[in-house]
């Protein structure tokens, strides 16, 4: 953590390293960030939300892609401070507004794009930093999807970044994401996959090696279902 804050973390999708404070999740698994950088944006995207911004890396990538206004949120005060420093370092601070809040910003127009990289494992965290990885009973994921449509333009998109590790170790059913999205008025329009390249995928002594070797990280593109869009 000391090195992450002082020497920085190299992010291939960004022009220079970012600083990560102690207690803030470090995006050392960067494979999904290339999806954020290269996936086609919704047409005429003027306003985007980065929900659970952490170090601010996703919001920074969106700003560098030319989205003129981004609102990034987090409940963690250290994350807000960390993201502020990184936005200044990358020169994107004028495009991004930070708000310390639970999930969605309080007052805003409807977004054209909402990006969220929630915790991937439905289990209980044992320390504050583990809340970035563990989500008991999928509570944060369910809350996010249950509210997303209220904050999204009818033709807007939700980009949900998730690993399928929980599905591979039988903590979630295989069709969990599309079914949960449908439950909350969203439909899947695309899914873009990438394979993680972190060291644990090659560690044969890891109890989860077999699952990690098959792990896929996906960017799920969601949009309001037709019946919901008609009401918006």
Residue ranges and their predicted role:
Residues 177-227:
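Class I S-adenosyl-L-methionine
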Residues 19, 97-99, 189:
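General small-molecule cofactor/ligand-binding pocket signal
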Residues 1-47, 51-57, 212-214:
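SAM-dependent Rossmann-like transferase core, predominantly class I methyltransferases
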